[in-house]
């Protein structure tokens, strides 16, 4: 059986001696078939919420920093960001090597460097990265060039909708 939404729902239907669905009647289900579809998504959500950093949710983001802009939003699908993986990528044009950014707490940033966001004279190659409470990253000092920032994060799981949707969870799980 195919490892997609339709296949998983039909696994439930076969185990309970129900009629299997097809791709043509999958979208218009009612009753037990709708329950089976909900059960598949519920099981996937349960697995995804059990652990924050499943390997199949791992992703890498590259973001071009904007000159004099210290704040950057999380990716829309980010559950957690590995703050120890944030780095500036080597770029010979900008004359910069790979630089691992030091993690700083938001409270420490506010105590020591809060004025830096308003003082546009304080620019350079970022040396610190700060996670804010509102799902943003702050680069300190604010960039003076269009550096490439790279970091790793873990995605939020997603519900399956159409018959051919494939779960992000590997089949062996």
Where are these predicted regions, by residue range?
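Glycine-enriched, solvent-exposed interface loops adjoining structured elements
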Residues: 1-173
């Amino acid at each position: 059986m195919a490892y997609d939404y339709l296949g998983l729902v039909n696994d439930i239907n076969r185990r309970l001696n129900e009629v299997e669905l097809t791709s043509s009647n999958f979208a218009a289900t009612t009753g037990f078939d709708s329950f089976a579809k909900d059960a598949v998504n519920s099981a996937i959500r349960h697995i995804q919420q059990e652990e924050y950093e499943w390997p199949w949710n791992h992703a890498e983001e590259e973001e071009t920093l904007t000159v004099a802009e210290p704040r950057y939003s999380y990716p829309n699908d980010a559950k957690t960001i590995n703050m120890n993986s944030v780095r500036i990528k080597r770029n010979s044009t900008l004359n910069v090597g790979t630089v691992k950014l030091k993690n700083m707490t938001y409270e420490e940033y506010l105590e020591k460097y809060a004025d830096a966001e308003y003082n546009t004279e304080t620019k350079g190659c970022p040396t610190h990265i700060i996670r804010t409470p509102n799902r943003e990253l702050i680069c300190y000092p604010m960039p003076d060039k269009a550096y490439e920032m790279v970091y790793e994060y873990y995605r939020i799981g997603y519900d399956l909708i159409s018959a051919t949707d494939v779960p992000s969870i590997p089949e062996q799980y």
